[in-house]
Amino acid sequence: MLIFIQTKEYSYRDPAAYIENGTIYLFFTLVENTPERQYFYVAVSRSTDFINWTEPEILTEKDNLKNYSSPGNVIKFNNDYYLCLQTYPRKDGQIYGNENSRIFTMKSKDLLNWEKPVLLKVKGDISECDMGRMIDPYLLDDGNKFICFFKQNGVSYSTSKDLANWQFQGFTECGENVCVIKEHNEYLIFNSPDNGINIMATKDFKTFTDVRTLYLNQENKPWAKDRITAGFVIDTSSISPYKYAMFYHGDNEDAYLFGASLAVAFSDDLATWYESP
């Protein structure tokens, strides 16, 4: 089910959702097309029924050398909300985020007003310039620790007790835009290969099993003809007849680079997906 469809001026990418008191907060990359260049922002929209959404509100600054984007998810810690996100610097002529791309968190008390981004030092106590290019963060509250997943050498992951001090743990081959949920003592890693939304499973982050790749009836979606990608799965049992919702975006770059629309699907078993809530 479509949420926001791309226009000449804007496209919508990289969804991440959080549910609080019956309200869905949908964070995403908003791409603005101007005659001079594209600008990337993190924006938010809200809904209580998956159908009616508020107008997007931009949360980050307009700066082509930062291009805050790709919100990963929100977690709550010590009564504060933390949203992880990336920078995606594109100097004149660069198509993709350059080697200065890094990952950050923003903190909030109310999910609406956010402090300035703070660098996620997921490689430990090394300088920012030595961290290497990294994008697409995702934070998992794993009970006695936090795990930060990010796109570098496939998917890399680091652990922390306090969201401030991190230890790098390793990496494995994987697509981008990782989202991780834990089911029955098993971690399910949703990720994006060249097309589709892939699911990998692991119990120990050492051995990984390929589960399936979802295409969500792409052939019937002209707005997603180039790619189905960036799946974000969340438990919606508190507000929906279905146990899960998966927000995602579909690429159609006929008009311009990074052209995309946001949509959502619903499931009880993570295998069969429905278009209507």
Regions found by a protein language model. Name each.
Residues 1-277:
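Carbohydrate-active catalytic/glycan-binding domains of CAZyme proteins
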